[in-house]
Amino acid sequence: MHHHKKLSYAALGLGILFLSFIIIKEEPWNPFQLLEPKALADVITDPTQPQPLIISVGPAGLIKGAIEANPAKDKENLEKLRTRLSQESKTRQVVIYCGCCPFKDCPNIRPAFSLLNQMGFKNHKLLNLTQNLKVNWIDKGYPMN
């Protein structure tokens, strides 16, 4: 009996490990595709830098130079985004953000980022707004439109 219990704990541990691996694997971006807010703010405020295409895929407000694509959770908005992106070179630096809430709760970033993956973009990033646009961008005094 005692031995059996140990075994089931081991199996449970493996199960949890496996589950967390699946959850991590599921995101359409990898850690290298997360762009820190400060890094983007530095580029935006430096006219000598090539400017990325910044796309807001949520309702949170426009970062300086960003274009509004409306919430990507809606199919119609996602199709408009596809049309807009089809005019860009696949090597264009693209930064998407939502900023409505933490990533785990956000309905907009996954469809938008997955679209960039599917379309074969090579230099696309997700702005790493860990909480929201207000806390991670506006409150830090980074530039807005």
Predicted regions and their residues:
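Alpha-helical scaffolding within the catalytic cores
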Residues: 38-43, 73-85
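Flexible, polar/low-complexity N-terminal or interdomain linker segments that lie immediately upstream
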Residues: 2-62
